[in-house]
Amino acid sequence: FLGNNELFLRKYPFVDCVFRGEGEEVFPQWLTCWNQPELWNDIAGLCYLNTDKQYRDNGTARVLNFSRLIPPEKSCFFNWDKPFVQLETTRGCFNTCAFCVSGGEKPIRTLSIENIRQRLQTIHEHGIKNIRVLDRTFNYNTHRAKELLQLFLEYPDIHFHLEIHPALLSEELKEELKQL
């Protein structure tokens, strides 16, 4: 949640709490004690008003085991009817841009190339033709970017949307992009 969490919670008393950060690990934790607010103190990223109406802020939740998360496309709720799929291969960003809410999210956490290959195969089997790669800066690491581009070449019928930082575009990577 972005914004003034305390103000939001006071303005909308029917909202019990909001999460700040990455919720994949902490939301299930909260579900085990959602009706016991006295147990919410140790849930990272949770912001709420306690029983005395005092604002509690448990900071920002971060998923440290990014590679262990269950891929969204394995969920029974995943919507395969869209013309595209979003694919996150990294989390975090090495930049600290003042205008960006993601800046300074360190460390950068990555999925293995094999993990991404398996996910691409699943996506391909569902007939998806467009993938939006959600990485903050696809080419932050030239070697990894090249590996991913080579992997993408294995799926010529899929279009990949990438966000590339022009200042980090090496000659080596430019040559790799020309092959696409």
Predicted regions and their residues:
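Radical SAM [4Fe-4S] cluster-binding motif and immediate context
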Residues: 67-180
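A short, sequence-level motif marking secondary-structure junctions
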Residues: 60-66
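A structural signal for well-ordered alpha-helical scaffolds and beta->alpha junctions
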Residues: 20-27, 62, 113-116, 145
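Glycine-rich beta-alpha loop elements in corrinoid/cobalamin-binding modules
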Residues: 1-59
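A conserved amphipathic helix/loop scaffold
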Residues: 50, 62, 77
